[in-house]
Each structure stands twice: as C-alpha cells, then as structure tokens.
Amino acid sequence: MADSGGTAAVAAPVVKRGSPNTRLLGTELWNAESGVAAKPQLNGAWFASVSDTLYRQYAAKYRQRFGAAPYRLSSLGYDAVLLTVRIGRDWRIGAPFPEARLRDAGGFAGIDGPFRFRDNMAERALEVQEIRGGTTVVVSPAPTGFGR
C-alpha cells in the first residue's frame, strides 16, 4: 500500500475480507510514522525501511546536545553535509565541482545505511520490517553495500 500506515490501517480490513491470507506490504513512509506498529489491522504487514541502527546513535547524541529528539528525516540533511565534505575535501576552490564523484557505483555510507545515485535517482539499501504484536521486527536486514 503506497500510502501512510494510517491509510493502510483503514484499508486493511477491506483487503483482508476479500483475501484473508494476503500479506500487506507498505513503503518506507511507515517507518517515519509514529504509532504505525500499534495498529492491530497492520499486524503481519511488511514494509521496506532504512535501518535504524546508526540513526538511533545519531538521535541519542542529538538529544544529549539539544535536549529534544531530531526530526526523523534530519538524517538526510546530515548525510548530505557529510557527502559534500567527503567529495569536496580534494576539490580545489575555483575548479569545477567534481560532480561525477556523486555517481560512485559503490555508493556512500550514511546514517540510514548505504546509498548511491543512479540515473539521477537516490538508491538506498533497505531492510524489510514486519509489524508484529505492537512492535516492528527486522525480517530481512539491509545489505551493507552495493556489491562491494
């Protein structure tokens, strides 16, 4: 279901009524939605997600420094700055920006796991999580890289 977990929870009973053994599949949107695991209609559903392992460390340090939890998508900005620093450290000011380095087939390590840019799109190594009994469980871990 390519929508929020809230919308999927509303639609789930209709889907299950027509086909009780259907496994619901969700998108990464569900990972950013607090309380999605508490929706009993979604029990057993799978959804793609970035790994939260490094994000939890980042969030703990952020909370310690600023006294509040970071917005979940702040990891994208964090990774963007780190990527710019990585590519820019060998860049001579005044020379053209080495944008070809953004297309490194091996990708880059980020807070949300490996990512790379292909065909002008961001590609991420995602894990699969299952909503199970009010929590989420990783059923297939994210790859640690792109073929390295």
Please provide the spans of the model-predicted regions.
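Short, low-complexity, Pro/Ser/Thr/Gly-rich segments in the mature regions of secreted, periplasmic
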Residues: 134-148
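Extracellular/periplasmic periplasmic-binding protein-like sensory domains
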Residues: 5-78, 91-92, 142
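Segments of small-molecule ligand-sensing domains
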Residues: 66-81, 85-138
